[in-house]
Curated annotation (Swiss-Prot):
The keyword Transcription regulation applies. Gene3D superfamilies: Transcription elongation factor, GreA/GreB, C-terminal domain (3.10.50.30), Transcription elongation factor, GreA/GreB, N-terminal domain (1.10.287.180). One of its GO terms (molecular function) is RNA polymerase binding. The gene is greA. The keyword Transcription applies. This is Transcription elongation factor GreA. One of its GO terms (biological process) is regulation of DNA-templated transcription elongation. Belongs to the GreA/GreB family. Keywords: Coiled coil, DNA-binding, Transcription, Transcription regulation. It comes from the Bacteria.
Length: 158
């Protein structure tokens, strides 16, 4: 099954992959060669640390390549959903009790980062928002209890 991903999320993954292949991988290969030159590999902490780093980098490269190969990249600027919330929407919500506004973009599971306001399409918040329109109210089951929000705006930004 192909995982939905925004074009911006795919670009971030490609940039990380490129950095790992063009910067990190060559650096760790150099570090291994330098550590190997120090002699006995059994008690060579630098060598073992560099090999461990190499293993991590190669694992991350494989993971990123797999994620990108299974991603269905969706250009959200071409979605004609209007004010209806679907994948890729940037939604501004107002807490009905406090009037505090929060802004989230609904993205694929692999690119979600709550600190950046990117919520996974499989998250309870995103599932509650999908299909709603500007002006609709939505009730979210939060750890602190139920919260009610009003959908202030829906946009499809890249």
């Amino acid at each position: 099954m192909r995982a939905p991903m925004t074009s911006k999320g795919a670009q971030r993954l490609r940039e990380e992959l490129d950095h790992l292949k063009s910067v990190k991988r060559p650096a760790v290969i150099t570090a291994i060669a330098e550590a190997r030159a120090h002699g006995d590999l059994k008690e060579n902490a630098e060598y073992h640390a560099a090999r461990e780093q190499q293993s991590f980098i190669e694992g991350r490269i494989k993971q990123l390549e797999g994620e990108l190969s299974h991603a269905e990249i969706i250009d959200i600027t071409k979605l004609a959903a209007g004010t209806k919330i679907v994948f890729g929407a940037t939604v501004t919500l107002a807490d009905t009790e406090t009037d505090e506004e929060k802004r989230y973009q609904i993205v694929g599971d692999l690119e979600a980062d709550i600190k950046l306001g990117l919520i996974a399409i499989s998250s309870p918040l995103a599932r509650a928002l999908i299909g709603k329109l500007e002006g609709d109210s939505v009730t979210i089951d939060a750890p602190a209890g139920q919260r009610e929000y009003e959908v202030v705006s829906v946009a499809y930004l890249d």
